[in-house]
């Protein structure tokens, strides 16, 4: 990145982080394909590093209705979703999953508000980009980023938003929900051969071939971020999924630890250079070793916080 960087000036000692104890839905077993324990582990690691957290409220139904069909929302909250729809999501819809899903949406909405106030913030969950208008998929129940974007637009807190989605999977649900919203720019950088098979168009899609490594990935990222910022957003939502990592079992790309750190740092620097607030969410990350995934997620916080500490 070229040019003088602007410092992210927090109105508090550290980068604002949002966490809710119900992010870890304990009804999901440890051997499930989705490493639910990572959320508690991320919080433990960051707490040990001296961070404190903002705790969000559970998103009210009215917020969820901004992005999702009320009948679908009611089926989740009432645990009446049919078995086929639940299988598409990948979870049994228990009270804990319903509560977790509302907490994650509330967390992204709170992180977005904190980002507008302080320059940047991170929700230590979120990034449920496969949830579409009338149903969930791929471990995603409610689309927290879409809800957050539409809520802030409705309230007039922002005039335009951009979504920079760097999870390894295409942001299909976000594209469907925000596709008709002219004030939202959606951009997805993903593995083209990966799930989902059908990829409804975002405003900008960059699909990378299997095995793409750091150099080619970061070159594509520059294009993605430049186009997103050219849309002149008042806020960027950044899905910082760590599933492009070479060791991720669902990823198919080959980023290193250094590559992920460079990605996160580049996004933060680009937003800071144009004084655009950044709301980051964790997104995906899949491994039988939940601690390894949690450590990768913690790298997001370190990368964003380092911009504020070291910027000229």
PLM feature spans:
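HDAC/HDAC-like amidohydrolase catalytic core signature
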Residues: 7-312
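Polybasic, low-complexity intrinsically disordered segments
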Residues: 1-7
């Amino acid at each position: 990145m070229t040019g003088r960087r602007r410092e992210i000036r927090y109105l508090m000692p550290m980068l604002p982080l949002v966490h809710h104890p119900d992010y870890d839905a304990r009804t999901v077993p440890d051997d499930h394909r989705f490493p639910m324990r990572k959320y508690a582990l991320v919080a433990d690691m960051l707490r040990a590093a001296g961070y404190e957290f903002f705790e969000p409220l559970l998103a009210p139904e009215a917020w969820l209705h901004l992005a999702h069909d009320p009948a679908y929302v009611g089926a989740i909250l009432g645990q009446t979703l049919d078995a086929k729809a639940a299988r598409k999501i990948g979870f049994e819809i228990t009270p804990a999953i319903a509560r977790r899903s509302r907490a994650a949406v509330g967390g992204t909405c709170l992180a977005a508000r904190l980002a507008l106030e302080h320059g940047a913030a991170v929700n230590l969950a979120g990034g449920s980009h496969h949830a579409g208008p009338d149903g969930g998929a791929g471990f995603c129940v409610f689309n927290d980023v879409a809800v957050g974007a539409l809520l802030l637009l409705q309230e007039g807190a922002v005039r335009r938003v951009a979504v920079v989605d760097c999870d390894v999977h295409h942001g299909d649900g976000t594209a469907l929900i925000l596709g008709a919203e002219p004030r939202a720019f959606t951009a997805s950088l993903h593995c083209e051969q990966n799930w989902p098979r059908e990829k409804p168009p975002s405003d900008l899609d960059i699909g990378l071939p299997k095995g793409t490594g750091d150099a080619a990935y970061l070159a594509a990222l520059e294009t993605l971020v430049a186009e997103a910022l050219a849309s002149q957003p008042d806020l960027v939502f950044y899905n910082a999924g760590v599933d492009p990592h070479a060791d991720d079992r669902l990823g198919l790309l080959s980023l290193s630890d250094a590559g992920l750190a460079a990605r996160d740092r580049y996004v933060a620097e680009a937003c800071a250079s144009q004084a655009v607030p950044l709301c980051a969410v964790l997104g995906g990350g899949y491994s039988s070793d939940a601690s390894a995934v949690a450590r990768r997620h913690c790298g997001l916080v370190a990368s964003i916080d380092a911009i504020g500490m070291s910027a000229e």
